[in-house]
Amino acid sequence: MSYQFPDNFNYADTHEYVLEENGLLKIGVSEFAIDQLGDIVFVELADQGKTLEKGETFGTIESVKAVEEVYLPFSGEIVSVNESVIDNPELLQNDPIGEGWLVIMKPESEESIADLMTSEQYKSKVVPK
């Protein structure tokens, strides 16, 4: 499978992507990680309005292969939860970097994405040469 690595995305070591939009940060899981999980059967996400610290889990993705937690790559408040992914987990599988986003966060600080990988750095980590 060939994966997309949009230039405007940043990535955490734990395969979450971050997309900055109007001062808010949209978070999801990379196509690579979703492909490794196989068929997604259940998604659970933290509630809107919840404030979390960097490294805390904000959700769980259950597939036929495994149950994986998703981690917050920075501290902040959840301002929106993608209810569509909870109702239709296949959205996450079919379009993880589009309609399959998980939450939108208001970051605690401007430097939130400074520690994350660029698309090129992430691609070199997950795609064999």
Residue ranges of each PLM-predicted region?
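Acidic, low-complexity mobile loops and tails
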Residues: M1-K54, E90, N94-K129
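Short, glycine/small-residue-enriched coil/turn segments at secondary-structure junctions
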Residues: Y3-P6, V70, F74
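Small beta-strand-rich domains/subdomains or short beta-sheet motifs embedded
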Residues: N10, E44, E62, E68-L72
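Residue-level recognition of beta-strand microenvironments
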Residues: V18-E20, V64, V81-S84
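Short, well-structured beta-strand-loop connectors
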Residues: D47-I61, L72, E77-V79
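Conserved "cap/hinge" positions at secondary-structure junctions
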Residues: E56, E62, N82-E83, P89, ...
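Domain-scale activation on soluble regions of proteins
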Residues: F58, V85, V126-P128
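Charged, amphipathic alpha-helical coiled-coil/dimerization segments
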Residues: S75, V79-S80, D87, Q93
